[in-house]
Amino acid sequence: MTVVLDHLAIGTPTLTDGWELFGGVLGGAWVYGGDSPGFWWGQLEFAAGPKIELMTPAGGPDAAFLERFLATRGASPHHFNFIVTDIEATLARIRALGIEPVQVNLANPYWKEAFLHPRSAHGIVIQVAQQAGSPRVAAPGELPEPGPSALFDLIEHRVGDLSGATRLFREVLDGRLESGDDDAAELAWPGGKLIRLVREDGLPLGGSLHHVRFTRADGAFSTHDKERAGLLAKRLGLTVELAGP
């Protein structure tokens, strides 16, 4: 069984800011997307690192979960997704850690999924999914041409219980411990995917996504890029660090 960090999902009432930031500024290229009950989603990939998924409500009773999220928090990071090869074995690992998954749905042979509530997952929803095949949908017309290529090379997540969070991401979600001490731990997955866990007390639900980092493989981000990215990221409830040579 393998578990791989696949994407960071962001809930938003409008997709334009996300397309401009992650596509136009940060060079994300369309992968796929489509309709799910109550919401539409689309994913962009980068030169390395996890994908970004944008989610927006599509109306109807099934949209209530995302509408509530946006009403409470506004546009902001919604979940981490991990793709697994054996979801039942992953669920057994999760339960062995004393965590009970929620919204477990194994009925669809093409997409089996379960979630960890933020109270159990150190401040953010975690989705684990077993996927068979990928939907092929044309890129949205409003998606800009990708900007210069960038690497999505870090997610920093602050947690109150560093030891417990490290166990979850390492023992259940197959993160390889790259470094760690009493204050922080870095875990990696294939494809240049890196989560840094940093201890911080007093966080709601025991954790909070602090920032993400993108690095240009060739050349530095311009002052205009940084200003534009900062404005767009703020609208998405996200802090983006731009790095370069």
Q: Model regions: which residues?
A:
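Core segments of cupin and vicinal oxygen chelate
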Residues: 1-3, 9-51, 89-112, 116, ...
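Vicinal oxygen chelate
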Residues: 4-13, 42-47, 52, 65-151, 178, 182-199, ...
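Anionic group-transfer/hydrolysis microenvironments
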Residues: 9, 55, 81, 119, ...
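A short alpha-helix capping/helix-coil boundary motif
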Residues: 20, 68-71, 145-146
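Conserved donor-binding loop and adjoining core beta-sheet/short helix segment
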Residues: 32, 50-67, 199-204, 243-245
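Generic hydrophobic/packing signal
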Residues: 58, 81-84, 95-98
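Short, flexible helix-coil linker/hinge segments at the edges of structured domains or between repeats
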Residues: 58-69, 132-142
